[in-house]
Amino acid sequence: MYFIEKKGLLFMKQGSKIGIVCCSNGLRPEQAETIKMLVQILEKSGLEVDLSPYLYGDENGQAGTARERAGALMKFYEDDSVTDIFDVSGGDMANEILSYLDFQTIAYGKKHFWGYSDLTTIINAIYARTGKSSVLYQIRNLTYDHSQSQITDFLNTTLAGSSSLYDFPYEFVQGTHMEGIVVGGNI
């Protein structure tokens, strides 16, 4: 395995293999360049990238059936060489795969699932069924506006063990601190 554990959190290191999936709405064909750029950024950072065969949607926006998308996700959970799984999708189809997931396999694997938008349904199901945390983050942020700061924060957090990806300015309206488990997300 190519990860280190620090304070209960897993971090990747150079040579880590990551999986990229699409559990919700398929990407549009014109987004292939974005994915190509994302893969280049990740590989340049020393990560090995494995892409799901179900990334791009058909005329109805589906990137394979729910069973196929779930199978692609489970393939990465079953692969001991994969340290993290990043979902590049979003939309309104993620809930379709829930009944096809093997939560026992997910519970056993030492890897995080990263997703955003309606992937919250998967993130919350993983927590509810396994007690494992996931990360609410869209990895395509590494290719958007302000990509350099996103790349720096992402690499500092995942490869160097800092928390810069999760640091943002905030102000308490009431009280001075909070603690506990945060469940929720985008939906």
Residue ranges of predicted features:
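Metal-dependent catalytic neighborhoods of phosphoester/phosphodiester hydrolases
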Residues: N60-G64, E96-D102
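Short, acidic/small-residue loops that bind anionic groups at enzyme active sites
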Residues: L101-A125, S133-R140
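Conserved anion/nucleotide-ligand pocket segment
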Residues: K132-I187
